Amino acid sequence: MASPRTARRVGATLVATVLFLASAGTAAAHSASLRSASESLSVPQWLFLLTGGAVIGASFLLVTFATDRSFVASIHEWRRPLAGRWLDTGRSVGSTLGVVALVGVIVAGVAGPETAVRNPAVMVVWVGWWAGFAMSAYLVANAWPAIDPLRAITSRLPTAGLEYPDRLGAWPSVVGLLALVFVEVVSPLADDPRLLATTIGIYAAITLVGAVAVGPPRWFADVDPVARVFRYYGRVAPIGWGGSGFELRLPGMALTRWTDVDGPGEVAFVVALVWVTTFDGLVTTAAWGDVAGWIVDAGVPSLAVYAVAMVAGYGVFLGVYRSAARLARRTAPTYLSAPMLARAFAPPLLAIAAGYHLAHFLGYFLTLLPALGAAIQHPIAGPAAPVALVLPAWFGALELAFVLAGHVLAIWVAHAVAFDLFPDRLQAIRSQYPFIAVMIAYTTLSLWIVAEPTLAPPYL
């Protein structure tokens, strides 16, 4: 049994290890659009990746020293209430701003400059929303329900009262997330303002029809992939809804006893959220260009190559995770079923998704932030000469730290989940082995992608 002092030493060791690795090399974030080449690492890639995978394995061994249940519970149950007097006002103002922003984005996409970096629609959607606002969902709190313009509009429309089939569960949101990212990768959605405005209009129309048919609460809870992404990211954030009001908690601690992941569709969505960010970065690597080139040269259409890669890669990610759940029943013999273990250990993966998203987009957001401001100030004519920031060479070390920090947080959350599930300490520790192996694999792949120079996806 570890004392609080021992646990503090373990935590300090983890932080020191992450910071040491962060200083070992540099890597630049990349995004699905407006890409720029990143710098190479200053250390051999094989050593970088091996060390990154080893630190996750070592962190698991260190975390196993914290076996005092009362100490673990004290960390995850720490809460501080926050004042919520501004809640109703915030929702009203947020929904109004959201509707205005939606209309403005569509108008700017149609009537604004054709150059992506000068068009406010492109800059607001990709830089302001999907990079900046998405980061705030897991770094601060999930404010999307209060801002979502489509939720605000549909909440004021009559509903048809149709019954949503329970058997579908969260699967429509899984398909929707994969489809959205696929379209974003294979089309000039991030470079063509007209296409972006059209796509947003189609998405809005589908959402309005669906929400009116089954009711906004059911639609945004089960079907809408964007709402689910932000809701899941919000569980990583230090501020969230505690039932009776907003509360401050330690980052990621809301993942330990989360009941929203209660079916195979929810598990599949968590894995999909990890996979789509990985896929978005994978297709910008030179290795992918070589593989895709070989297949396209053999006569296979490029879109088919990307589609198969998206579906097959997701199938591998999901299959590996499900196999880990089945294997956990053998490493820690238990009456709990593999699907139940899969549901219990899925929320920690959201810390991985958040860490990689932060590494993937923070540099992109900071680089294009001045251009975003300039585009908003000149929505129709566009800025004459958009300015992009040049990040210092050491910034790449932060990206490495974000990936590793996300994985270490995921391991700690999985540790708490295991101790909540199993009464025996050894059983709780052994149940984590397969899931930690999966996390090490995800870490190694993520670090490799971050380490690679960023190229435009080929053959598109």
Region roles according to the model:
Residues 2-250, 255, 279, 403, ...:
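Transmembrane-helix bundle segments that line or gate the permeation/cavity pathway
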Residues 220-326:
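Long, internal scaffold/assembly segments composed of regular secondary structure
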Residues 445-460:
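Juxtamembrane boundary at the C-terminal end of a transmembrane helix
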